[in-house]
Amino acid sequence: SLRRSISLDFFIYNVLPGTTSAAGVKAHFLKAIILGESTVDEISSDFAFELLMHMKGGTSIDVLLDLALGDDEAITGQAAEVLKTQVFLYEADMDRLKLAYESGSAIAKGILESYASAEFFTKIPDIEENIEVVTYIAGEGDISTDLLSPGNQAHSRSDRELHGKTL
């Protein structure tokens, strides 16, 4: 139905990642799908892992660690591969990996070795040599240092000359 489609699109594309309460609900629901505790025809276990990967940290890391350090070997391996792509881990997450490693977990060892080798960076796919930007639209006041900088208030910045030269 249309409502189901809209709901799925919202869940997949519009729930903010990170540490928001909504992200927590999304991550735990995806975990339930992966474990077979919940079923959504449009979200397979593989797609649930992909969605967790795109959440890039926060509560998704906790869920991925639960899955990677669990008992189901098919799930642990897949969760470990996703974890190896993530960079936003907290100290508590690393402590969980350390404890699992010290307890003899081969999965934890593999994840830690991957981080030590910076595979989260070295295994990023190559990008094209030349990327053309066809159109970029930003309303007045919406341009910030995070995007193109300087914004319409650049005259008040002490580094405006530097920012002006970068444009």
What residues fall within each predicted segment?
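Structural detector for internal amphipathic alpha-helices that build alpha-solenoid repeat scaffolds
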Residues: L2-S21, I43-K56, D66, T76-F88, ...
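Feature captures the catalytic cores and cofactor-binding loops of soluble hydro-lyases/lyases
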Residues: H155-L167
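N-terminal, positively charged, Ser/Thr/Ala/Gly-biased leader segments
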Residues: K98-A154
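Short inter-helical turns and helix N-cap capping residues of alpha-solenoid HEAT/ARM repeat scaffolds
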Residues: V40-D41, D71-D72, G104-S105
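Alpha-helical scaffold segments in soluble metabolic enzymes
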Residues: V63, Q78, L147
